[in-house]
């Protein structure tokens, strides 16, 4: 009986943990799992699935910027919570209702040629969902430790800020290293 009387008092002090509003962002490989392409073949199609899960408490407007870099260029910085200074190759904008997820399929084709004399892989273009992005013959140097011509494809997440009327970096990105040999 004492417990029944005291339960409203106890409820004030012991309640379910409050969840913090957040956005989850992840990438899945061609088979909708964590099997990602690494050793790429020029001209082949590599599907990726980007998923954004909105747990912000309200509908949200997002933008994903796709970028590519070699080992010497800087990417996003997890410790300083900053995005990469590289220009995006393309972007995707969309809205996600509260408590729901959006999945974007991104089909990528890397067109490149290996220059054995110079010890580089020359990236001519990346085709994103059928649209060509000129990479201007971007050289990817040989990495003797990885035994590969490494490039990094990454996607940065931005959230629309109604107060400023701009998209702001949401401190979330996904990244895949690929070998263009």
What are these language model-derived features?
Residues 1-8, 114:
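Helix-rich terminal scaffold detector
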Residues 6-63:
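Membrane-interface segments at or immediately adjacent to transmembrane helices
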Residues 65-67, 120-167:
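Internal, hydrophobic beta-strand segments that form the core of beta-sheet-rich folds
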Residues 163-181:
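Short beta-strand elements
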